[in-house]
């Protein structure tokens, strides 16, 4: 328990505690007077008895976050998330609040920090095209989301008493919906597409709701298009890996991601990154996606062409068993497909969208076809939760909204108007055929 000590006319509350690193330490807390010391002593003892006592710590925010990254980040973040989150910490957290004591960082300090971020120069300004001069609201939102997660762990580890990053005042973020093609626009694009690789990629992305990294990592052992599969309407893909380009220094840092293979892509300049074939993102489990017969036949024909090329090239062909690859068997990167797609749009004067938007179009179209079956759509897209489908992919197309308005008019307002008309005509017929009732109504109206 705590005790009160008077030393040279000053009062101290003295107590022992187990520190964050497991060591037994003694703490002396100075008080202004004896009354304050009594109050402080009782407060500490009550917190200990109620098991809410927090061991005092001089740990800085930077020190805590480094522990957080080591214990939490390496186990829960994918390669891309790890790079992005550590970048946010190095650029916008450590320089501004890294030396602050974590236990004394209050909700007021949080709002002051956010306000300071809005006036902080963007590290990419002048480096990347169209980068804003100051930290954008979306970046601030990402920083706060990361710190909210960190403080949640700090609360769990009994480092702080509350999560000060909950309900903080964020700057307004203007959310822009991603432009997507309608099914009609996709049909038109496929009709005029002469690039065989791009043609197949568009079909796979739209019909199977694939991410571009999953699409390019698809291997023939996960494609089921044999005759018996067609007979049973069981043509399908298994999605269990993806292609990503990562920093070479990241390999071996994380324990969460399993890297199956690294590729040397023979770039002209020395590169700090490497293309890897790896497991799915965010603890993603392998998923089965059933494919339309037309797409299955496309794949069957594509495989025949690929086998013919293998025979011609012989040992020159680098067989990685990839469905989408260059003629020599080497993998195609997402930037290659994105550039092809962008050029295809420009040459044919099509509405500008990015390749990833085909996945959005796919989810939207499947939701419409299934009349809102979110779980079935989620099974194809591979999203972690159904809520992500409703938030990200349930775009409402204007044509459907007009149809809904027309249906509402016909089913609600028009029917009501007809009912009112019917009621009036029915009453008139009753009066015509009932002389006594008609005379009684005349007398009532004359009063």
Pin down the residues of each PLM region.
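Short, polar N-cap/turn motifs at the start of nucleic acid-interacting alpha helices
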Residues: 223-231, 236, 333, 352, ...
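C-terminal catalytic core of tyrosine-transesterase DNA break-rejoin enzymes
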Residues: 156, 203, 207, 214, ...
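Catalytic-site neighborhood detector that most strongly recognizes the C-terminal catalytic loop/helix
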Residues: 172, 180, 231-232, 243-245, ...
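Long, amphipathic, Lys/Arg-enriched alpha-helical "connector/arm" segment
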Residues: 127-129, 173-198, 207-210, 272, ...
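Flexible interdomain linker/hinge and immediately adjacent N-terminus
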Residues: 111-113, 156-190, 327
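N-terminal DNA-binding recognition helix of tyrosine site-specific recombinases/integrases
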Residues: 1, 92, 103-108, 123-167, ...
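Conserved tyrosine-mediated DNA breakage-rejoining catalytic core shared by Y-recombinases
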Residues: 7, 185, 218-308
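N-terminal DNA-binding module of tyrosine recombinases/phage integrases
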Residues: 6-108, 304-318, 398, 413, ...
